[in-house]
UniProtKB/Swiss-Prot annotation:
Induction: By bacterial infection. It is found in: Secreted. It holds the Pfam family Moricin. Monomer. GO terms for biological process: defense response to Gram-negative bacterium; defense response to Gram-positive bacterium; innate immune response; response to bacterium. This is Moricin. Antimicrobial peptide. Active against a broad spectrum of Gram-positive and Gram-negative bacteria including methicillin-resistant S.aureus ATCC 43 300, S.aureus BAA-39, pathogenic strains of L.monocytogenes, K.pneumoniae, E.coli O157:H7, S.typhimurium and multidrug-resistant S.typhimurium DT104 with minimum inhibitory concentration (MIC) of 1.4 uM for all except for S.aureus BAA-39. Also active against Serratia marcescens. Probably acts by disturbing membrane functions with its amphipathic alpha-helical structure. May protect a developing embryo from bacterial infection. The keyword Secreted applies. Its main location: secreted.
Amino acid sequence: MKLTSLFIFVIVALSLLFSSTDAAPGKIPVKAIKQAGKVIGKGLRAINIAGTTHDVVSFFRPKKKKH
């Protein structure tokens, strides 16, 4: 357990040393994030429509009798 915590501590220390501390908001691809959000939204809508269609069809379909 102590070896794992020591390893994590070393990795965190190295990442703090080698990472830049300045934020660069100009480098964030806002258009790509918006486009991905639209695609994900359309996918979720399609899943919702498919689920609703399945519910409606299963409601009106006659149920099979079990033996």
